[in-house]
Amino acid sequence: NITKDHLDYHETFRKYKLSKLKILNFLKENGTFILDADNKLLNEMVNKKKFKSKNIIKITKDKTYNYVNDNDYLQGAHNASNCSLAVSIAKHLNITLEKIKFAIENFKGLPHRMEPIYISDRIKIINDSKSTNGESTAAALKSYKNIFWIAGGQPKSGGIGDAKNFLDRVIEVFLI
């Protein structure tokens, strides 16, 4: 994932992108690079880079989206994209579709990352306190409707960024 984050450490978005691409320097000639074809920025960056390996697999959001939505821990288009990448890697490693589906359906998520705290027919309480920038907050807000949003922490440059595009889904905001 390449988003405008960690600029406090990298200083500029350009330096951050270059830092992310350094991992590709370790890709061996017979190695495989799996690329999220839906990510325009990542595609632009990768197209400019020379690789030792010619084995590049481009993937898009595919059938994984159908069963991602059944898992309360994997809501949202960003998680569909993450699952698509994971499925592509698993297929490349010859893991059966049955095992892949089982793993996705039984994934319990990570603490503070769109973590379901309470779910009933009427209400969902989600802890997404790891969303510390506008882009990750936007991904969370885009995943739900009728939101009561509790926000806090230290402001980052760029404010709430892309999250402002999904404020129509928010009923009330509580700043702490």
Which residues does each predicted region cover?
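Short, conserved loop/helix-junction motifs that constitute active-site signature segments
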Residues: 23-30, 49-52, 143-144, 164-171
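Residues that form or immediately flank small-molecule/cofactor binding pockets and catalytic motifs
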Residues: 38, 60-64, 109, 119
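Flexible active-site lid/hinge loop adjacent to a nucleotide/diphosphate
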Residues: 1-49, 63-74
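Short internal beta-strands
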Residues: 33-38, 150-152, 169-176
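Beta-strand->loop->alpha-helix junctions that form or flank phosphate-binding loops
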Residues: 50-66, 76, 101-105, 115, ...
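Short, surface-exposed linear patches
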Residues: 2-4, 18-24, 55-59, 78, ...
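Nucleotide phosphate-binding/pyrophosphate-handling subdomain across enzymes
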Residues: 72-171
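Generic alpha-helical hydrophobic packing signal
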Residues: 45-50, 55-59, 87, 92
